[in-house]
């Protein structure tokens, strides 16, 4: 049974300002979890001559995934959720999936939820779509 559906978009140019501004390190620590920071190399400067377009698009999609989850949960950003506890990761197949930690993982487990995630980016925008599903009642 569907528990909730959430969708979010993120403008790449807006996120780029957050990732390159004077408070970029604090933003990354607050918003992205450890697996996302590693996969996106958010704590590593880009090599000279590298545009970072793919990294930026992936970071925007991951940010949108977090927002989409919060909308599907129906709570917005409030207790027990912390942004960095809601991570968008890639499976071995390349498909996106959620990884939860801390109080968010407990909330998901307590509600018996399975989270489904779809990501896309094009034309300077990233999109995430989240479906939270409960097990069918028997």
Regions found by a protein language model. Name each.
Residues 1-138:
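Core catalytic alpha/beta fold that binds nucleotide/phospho-ligands
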